[in-house]
Design a protein with these regions (language model features):
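A nucleotide-sugar donor-handling region in carbohydrate enzymes
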Residues: 135-182
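Aromatic- and Gly/Pro-rich donor/ligand-binding loops
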Residues: 1-135, 144, 180-182
Length: 182
């Protein structure tokens, strides 16, 4: 049986329950389907162990290509949450931290899109969300980045509307329940 190597992008380097939960749910679902897979977690900063006692290594997104060259990823899954924008913000990485770092959450979907294009790797969106319509300047860029997505699911109709306003075909975008409920 083939073992699938899957890269996951999300905010695994921040103590955030939902983002840390999805790889566990995914792994269990694959196991029930008889699919053997190895998960590689990537985040904007990375170089930490995943929280909540899971102890999986979280790699920085800039190492995505390097690890693909070594492990040959079969797919990249972009995690959910409010990531569909081009902004960064100041973020505490854990509850004991006192230092705010510049956290480029947009990298969790932009870098995988470029990577998938360059490497012809399957790209799957797992329910990311948007907060506001993109400025005119960003709409063509967003449309180009989304052409590499093989399966695009978003968390709500509002996010779907944001993407269709970028001329992404509505029939390519699926609105689904949070995957924690699958």
């Amino acid at each position: 049986m083939k073992k699938y190597n899957i890269a996951f992008t999300g905010v695994f380097d921040i103590e955030n329950y939902g983002d840390h939960l999805f790889p566990l749910i995914f792994r269990e679902k694959m196991k029930k389907k008889g699919i053997d897979c190895e998960l590689f977690l990537f985040s904007p900063i990375g170089d930490v162990q995943q929280g909540y006692q899971q102890n999986y290594e979280v790699y920085p997104l800039y190492k995505l290509q390097e690890l693909h060259d070594r492990y040959h990823f079969d797919a990249v899954i972009v995690g959910g949450g409010g990531i569909l924008h081009y902004a960064s913000g100041k973020q505490l990485l854990d509850k004991n931290s006192t230092e705010f770092v510049d956290y480029k959450v947009f990298e969790t979907w932009v870098i995988p899109s470029l990577f998938a294009y360059n490497n012809k790797v399957k790209l799957i969106w797992n329910l990311p969300g948007g907060f506001h319509e993109f400025d005119y300047f960003y709409k063509p860029l967003t449309r180009c980045l989304c052409t590499t997505v093989d399966y695009m699911s978003v968390r709500d109709q509002y996010t779907k509307d944001i993407l269709t306003s970028c001329n992404i075909p509505a029939d390519k975008i699926y609105t689904c329940l949070d995957s924690a409920f699958i």
